[in-house]
């Protein structure tokens, strides 16, 4: 210890020499500051931010002086200073425990003498730093220096006798003042790391915001760049998030604005609406004559047609490559109506359609069609914008203070009538509809649509018991055409809802109705017997009533009540079955209905009775018509019609077929095939047929080519998998195992793709002559399909496309369908 004291004395003398010139001034300041010490300490806790700037400035000035003083003190002071800073940051163990104890004692000796001369004039905020740093430092060292407490006390007494000042902390313990926190010119270097560490004791000051110091600028070049790079993506993601948020808000707003009509009370007494306002129809654009270089020839001679005759000629020219123009009835009807539009001279000249040359006109319209396909993006956008403008202006109406979409707000342009099936009036001219042909329907208190300039409406009505907005009579069959609301509208939704609910009610009394008509087979009245047999056919075969016509239905179709003797054949036994009836007649759209069905013996006997003494073109049910049948159906159940029977039988057939065909272990494509097969059974029941598409054979060849290519791909994948497995047995390393797993997954993926293609081919082949969409959209209760999808995990998008989901699956239907495929939700069990 004597050697240590000698060494310490020499150090103290060196320190005294440096500070001797300031001694008297500091003593004076010390006496003044000691008086306010306690008060200032308390005050500094709340005013750190006010004193930080001047204290930081002093720190910077004193760092420069410390650098100069450190050069004078030499290596000895550097080691001592390094040990001092390592003590603060917890790095004391690097230089060994042996030197640490000795250096700590020397360090404390020097600090005590410095406190005597230099610590008196410290600033208030710096003294607070010092006390808190010392307190933290002591907390970290108290376990290591517990055995040396007595020695420290003795040393403190010695220094106090020499005039040293003790700095008393808030916890009541004396602690040496640390050199590293000394802002004075004491010849010690304060590193940026040490200064940075000083921020920790200020954690209790909530308002304190550490000021960046110059010594950190070296690190901040790269760091700041990284921070900027980190910030940019965040801003981007935030912007993206905002966009998504806006989209979600828009979608949510649209959902909120959607009319929840199913929650409102319905109008009574047949009232469909109380307020209706719209802008009227959009008429077809006027005819634009073809250019002069587009010639028409008759019998090899150039003929200049009048505008009206030329317009009708263009209708035929546009269809020149179609099979319709080869049909005699089409050509005959066209030529007859075309001559009505000709002038007298043209009628006298053009007497034979076969001598007319429409090739130049046809070529011109083909070029026009190609030009439309090759339009620039800007041209297409311009047309799209114009269509959108018309849609916003004419495509919506206000019904009962709600905006509703109109289905077909454009008047059909003039052209040639094609009809459904082999219609006898195909080829006739559909005349241009003018405002004078139009009947407007709207509410009295609405703004009545304005007719085009120079024209007026035929009539304006205010009939709230009908759902159409505009009507006119077309000239081909004299039928009335309408502009109606979109299928997603309230009126259409209510109509569909009522139709399916009526079919569900029929389930409750269908057995009673069946028992009734079976009893009527034995009635003494021929009228009752015919009615009972017709109802049996409607129930069992889902036949249409006959004269019951829907919009656009042609006049040459045959239904149940309009069957003639020539349409059926009776077989006592056929193909091992008794009492077989063969039906063969043109159904709706002139589609042939051909079916052989075994019937009840009583029905068979009645049919023989009905056919007695009748010619082939005589009515089979000569005592029955649709009015009599519908009246009887209404007596059996309110709202019951032949169409309700078709809806009921179609829906229950779908439900039964889904139960039989669906396998819960199948994958989604196989389940969809099962659904389509169930749908196919319904389409066959309802006779929803179609002609095979012209491109069917070509599309099947392309599909078969894809299947063959996929099979080759699967064979290659299996070979690679087998080879990888063989390598894995030899190498037995992780990389080979991963390769085997990858090849295995590739085989499974290709197998699944092949199966999808094969299912698609089967589906197409089975349904090439079956129209699945008609029954799906008009006769099948959507709740059955929705419940099936939920039960078997099939996306509803695989069953209904976007438009169908919007129009058919209204919110009311969705809300009443749960994921449980139970008897209540199955609708018809």
Curated annotation (Swiss-Prot):
<dbReference type="InterPro" id="IPR048045">
    <property type="entry name" value="Topoisomer_I_DNA-bd"/>
</dbReference>
<comment type="function">
    <text>Releases the supercoiling and torsional tension of DNA introduced during the DNA replication and transcription by transiently cleaving and rejoining one strand of the DNA duplex. Introduces a single-strand break via transesterification at a target site in duplex DNA. The scissile phosphodiester is attacked by the catalytic tyrosine of the enzyme, resulting in the formation of a DNA-(3'-phosphotyrosyl)-enzyme intermediate and the expulsion of a 5'-OH DNA strand. TThe free DNA strand then rotates around the intact phosphodiester bond on the opposing strand, thus removing DNA supercoils.</text>
</comment>
<keyword id="KW-0539">Nucleus</keyword>
<feature type="domain" description="Topo IB-type catalytic">
    <location>
        <begin position="488"/>
        <end position="821"/>
    </location>
</feature>
<keyword id="KW-0799">Topoisomerase</keyword>
<feature type="compositionally biased region" description="Basic and acidic residues">
    <location>
        <begin position="37"/>
        <end position="58"/>
    </location>
</feature>
<feature type="region of interest" description="Interaction with DNA">
    <location>
        <begin position="641"/>
        <end position="643"/>
    </location>
</feature>
<feature type="site" description="Interaction with DNA">
    <location>
        <position position="706"/>
    </location>
</feature>
<feature type="site" description="Interaction with DNA">
    <location>
        <position position="468"/>
    </location>
</feature>
<feature type="compositionally biased region" description="Basic and acidic residues">
    <location>
        <begin position="68"/>
        <end position="159"/>
    </location>
</feature>
<dbReference type="GO" id="GO:0007059">
    <property type="term" value="P:chromosome segregation"/>
</dbReference>
<feature type="active site" description="O-(3'-phospho-DNA)-tyrosine intermediate">
    <location>
        <position position="779"/>
    </location>
</feature>
<keyword id="KW-0413">Isomerase</keyword>
<feature type="region of interest" description="Interaction with DNA">
    <location>
        <begin position="481"/>
        <end position="482"/>
    </location>
</feature>
<dbReference type="GO" id="GO:0005694">
    <property type="term" value="C:chromosome"/>
</dbReference>
<feature type="site" description="Interaction with DNA">
    <location>
        <position position="420"/>
    </location>
</feature>
<dbReference type="InterPro" id="IPR011010">
    <property type="entry name" value="DNA_brk_join_enz"/>
</dbReference>
<keyword id="KW-0238">DNA-binding</keyword>
<dbReference type="InterPro" id="IPR013030">
    <property type="entry name" value="DNA_topo_DNA_db_N_dom2"/>
</dbReference>
<dbReference type="Pfam" id="PF14370">
    <property type="entry name" value="Topo_C_assoc"/>
</dbReference>
<feature type="site" description="Interaction with DNA">
    <location>
        <position position="688"/>
    </location>
</feature>
<dbReference type="InterPro" id="IPR014727">
    <property type="entry name" value="TopoI_cat_a/b-sub_euk"/>
</dbReference>
<feature type="region of interest" description="Disordered">
    <location>
        <begin position="1"/>
        <end position="248"/>
    </location>
</feature>
<feature type="site" description="Interaction with DNA">
    <location>
        <position position="588"/>
    </location>
</feature>
<feature type="site" description="Interaction with DNA">
    <location>
        <position position="499"/>
    </location>
</feature>
<dbReference type="Pfam" id="PF01028">
    <property type="entry name" value="Topoisom_I"/>
</dbReference>
<dbReference type="InterPro" id="IPR051062">
    <property type="entry name" value="Topoisomerase_IB"/>
</dbReference>
<dbReference type="GO" id="GO:0003917">
    <property type="term" value="F:DNA topoisomerase type I (single strand cut, ATP-independent) activity"/>
</dbReference>
<dbReference type="GO" id="GO:0006260">
    <property type="term" value="P:DNA replication"/>
</dbReference>
<dbReference type="GO" id="GO:0006338">
    <property type="term" value="P:chromatin remodeling"/>
</dbReference>
<dbReference type="InterPro" id="IPR013500">
    <property type="entry name" value="TopoI_cat_euk"/>
</dbReference>
<protein>
    <recommendedName>
        <fullName>DNA topoisomerase 1</fullName>
        <ecNumber>5.6.2.1</ecNumber>
    </recommendedName>
</protein>
<dbReference type="GO" id="GO:0032922">
    <property type="term" value="P:circadian regulation of gene expression"/>
</dbReference>
<dbReference type="InterPro" id="IPR036202">
    <property type="entry name" value="TopoI_DNA-bd_euk_N_sf"/>
</dbReference>
<dbReference type="InterPro" id="IPR001631">
    <property type="entry name" value="TopoI"/>
</dbReference>
<comment type="similarity">
    <text>Belongs to the type IB topoisomerase family.</text>
</comment>
<feature type="site" description="Interaction with DNA">
    <location>
        <position position="630"/>
    </location>
</feature>
<feature type="site" description="Interaction with DNA">
    <location>
        <position position="557"/>
    </location>
</feature>
<dbReference type="InterPro" id="IPR025834">
    <property type="entry name" value="TopoI_C_dom"/>
</dbReference>
<dbReference type="InterPro" id="IPR018521">
    <property type="entry name" value="TopoIB_AS"/>
</dbReference>
<dbReference type="InterPro" id="IPR014711">
    <property type="entry name" value="TopoI_cat_a-hlx-sub_euk"/>
</dbReference>
<dbReference type="InterPro" id="IPR008336">
    <property type="entry name" value="TopoI_DNA-bd_euk"/>
</dbReference>
